[in-house]
Design a protein with these regions (language model features):
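Surface-exposed acidic, glycine-flexible loop patches that form ligand/cofactor-binding
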Residues: 80-86, 185-189
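Acidic catalytic loop of the alpha/beta-hydrolase fold
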Residues: 98-102, 133-134
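Active-site nucleophile elbow and catalytic-triad environment of alpha/beta-hydrolase enzymes
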Residues: 65-83, 97, 108-110, 160
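Loop/turn elements at helix/coil->beta-strand transitions in domains of secreted/extracellular proteins
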Residues: 19-23, 88-90, 121-123
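Primarily recognizes the serine-hydrolase "nucleophile elbow" in alpha/beta-hydrolase
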Residues: 1-53, 64-75
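Short beta-strand/loop motif that positions the catalytic acidic residue
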Residues: 87, 93-95, 99
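Short, solvent-exposed loop/turn and secondary-structure capping segments
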Residues: 36-39, 104-106, 137-138
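C-terminal catalytic histidine-bearing segment of alpha/beta-hydrolase fold enzymes
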Residues: 109, 113, 117-190
Length: 190
């Protein structure tokens, strides 16, 4: 499983609840459910609240959402945190150090701590200073900000063009290596 942004939130949930997911790459995602409830069979995870008053608007009118969401570490939000310790395989967190959309580094560190507290050592984080939120395959153009439905303003994704491009190249190599190490021969595990 490879996923990015809100998709990484869903991808991490799938890793926790679906035994078929045996290796997971989460690119700038979260370790909990935000915005809308997550429903799977009889399970319903309520989202961690967001705080519109925490949205920051820069001089050009673009929105920074980095501090907009509630904190998964708060006791009242624990029911929304994914049980990453239940995942069936390793998890690789790819993090942009200049992510303006999510507090991705904190989310990844929280998930890794959770894995370790349950005796798991198969989680790993790769941090790319200067990379923004949308770390995609190499040579895709960097998107510093874009219009997003419902905001009525551009949303900042972050990233320095040179550092972001380098991160995309390096991250892609690491992702391919991760999947080669963890998926080759995994069909026999199902």
């Amino acid at each position: 499983m490879i996923s990015v942004s809100k998709g990484a939130e869903i991808g991490l949930a799938m890793a926790c609840y679906l035994k078929q997911v045996v290796a997971t790459v989460c690119i700038n995602g979260s370790n909990a459910i935000f915005e809308v409830p997550l429903r799977y069979r009889d399970l319903v995870l309520t989202p961690i609240p967001s705080f519109p008053e925490r949205m920051e608007v820069n001089a050009s009118g673009a929105v920074r959402l980095r501090h907009y969401k509630g904190d998964p570490r708060d006791e009242s939000n624990q029911q929304s945190v994914f049980p990453v310790e239940k995942s069936k395989g390793p998890i690789l967190f790819i993090i942009g150090g200049d992510d303006e959309c999510f507090n991705s580094r904190d989310y990844a560190e929280q998930a890794l701590n959770q894995l370790q507290s349950h005796g798991r050592s198969d989680g790993r984080m790769l941090l790319y200073p200067g990379a923004g939120h949308l770390i995609e395959p190499p040579y895709w153009p960097m998107c510093y900000g874009s219009w997003t439905r419902g905001l009525f303003r551009p949303l900042l994704w972050g990233g320095d063009p040179v550092l972001h491009a380098a991160a995309q190249e390096q991250a892609w190599r690491e992702i391919l290596k991760f999947f080669r190490q963890n998926l080759v021969g995994s069909r026999s595990k199902f």
